[in-house]
Structures are given as structure tokens and as C-alpha cells.
Amino acid sequence: TLEMVRPDPAERVRSLQLYGVNPAVMAKAATMLVERDLTDHIDLNFGCPVPKVTKKGGGAALPWKRDLFSDLVGAVVRACNEAGERAGREIPVTVKIRIGIDSEHETATDAALSAQKLGAAALTLHARTQNQHYAGQAHWDEIARLKDLLDIPVFGNGDVFEAADALAMLERTGCDGISVGRGAQGRPWIFRDIVAAYHGGTIPPGPSLAEVVSVIER
């Protein structure tokens, strides 16, 4: 597993995303990654809606268990602070969540405030519920609400498939940044396009078939 996360020497900044349900195991994993110099940043993923994960109480289902959520985030933040101090560098921990289980069981407010209190450096909201999975429309107004609620940076996620979507999210929510998920699958150049659009530049033309094939082969 460690070989799967080993970065290219040229990569900076290196980020790794973890998920789990056991605070002690998660803290140990974070410590190992920092001590072996495999990451500069840990993101805790509480956004996965896949049944095989949520049925075990993980992913998007975990924030419903407030005490466990707090224990897990706190354990990883402490582990990264301690391991980072020994390594002589700062290792920020960020948290990704969803709106809640469904429209009747919202968890984002408590989870976001808890993560901030426990020392999370930033929070990402996938603006859908667990039950929505990836269907329907993302509720960007929830991103704006958390942005107003928190003092730490808030990143938006959901329904960003092209540069225009990213600019629209920034304008409508006031979020501090964009997290791209499915929009990058098969289209890694979306990041180039977003950067160009954000800085007022011209979005480069799409890649040729030969370039796409080259990326797939790599």
C-alpha cells in the first residue's frame, strides 16, 4: 500500500486522502506517512457515499456519530502536529464532508464547527447528501452557508465539469477554493483550464486525439 502512495520526487505539495472509522488506526497511519516523508498534507474523507463504506459507518455516514467524528479528526490532527514537529515541518489536516445523510438528517453544520475547533486547516463540502450519491444537482447554497459560518477556508465541491462551472461556484458561494472530483476523470486538463479562466486568460483548445491517447498510455 505504501508503494501506491509513494510520490514522484518532483511532486510538491504532496497530499494524501485517508478514510476510516478507527481514530487510533487513522492516527497511526498519518504518523507513518509523515515520518516516512510521503506527504505534506492529510485530507480526511467523510464524503464517500458508497454503501460498502457507509454500511460500516464510514465515509459520509460517519459525521452522524458526532463523538466518533470528533475523536477521529482530533486524533489525526494531534498525530500530524506531533509527527510534523519531530520532522521540522507543518502538516495541515483538512476535512471533506457532505451535507448530511439526507434532507432530514443534516450533519454538515456540527461536523464543520467540530473540525474547525479541533484544528482542521480547511474544510471541503461536497454539496450533496449521502443518499444523493452523485445524482441531482449540487446545492451550492450550502457551500455559501458554511463559508459564512466558519473562520477557516471553505472549498466547494460538486458539479464542476469545466472552467465556467468553477468560476460560477466561486461567484455564487464566495468559497476560498474549488475541489474537482468527477470533473477530472478523463479530463485532467480541467485544472489548466480553470487556472487560465480564473486569471482572465484564454482557455486553451482541447487536446488532440493523439494527446489524449498519450495521457491514457502514461
Segments from the language model and where they lie:
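Hydrophobic faces of well-ordered beta-strands that scaffold small-molecule active sites
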Residues: R14-L18, D40-I42, V93-I97, L125, ...
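Glycine-rich tight-turn/loop motif centered on a GG-T
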Residues: R12, P51-F69, R128-W140, Y198-I203
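Alpha/beta catalytic cores of nucleotide-metabolism and tRNA/nucleoside-modifying enzymes
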Residues: R78-A79, A83, G88-R89, E104-A122, ...
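Non-cysteine beta-strand/loop elements that form the S-adenosyl-L-methionine
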Residues: H41-V50, L118-A127, V180-A184
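Glycine-rich, positively charged N-terminal anion/phosphate-binding segment
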Residues: T1-R36, D40
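Active-site glycine- and acidic-residue-rich loops that bind
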Residues: A24-M26, D67, P92-D110
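Active-site beta-loop-alpha junctions enriched in small/polar residues
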Residues: Y19-V21, G47-P49, K96-D102, R128-Q130, ...
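Short amphipathic alpha-helices and their capping/turn segments at secondary-structure boundaries
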Residues: V25-I42, A108-K117, E171
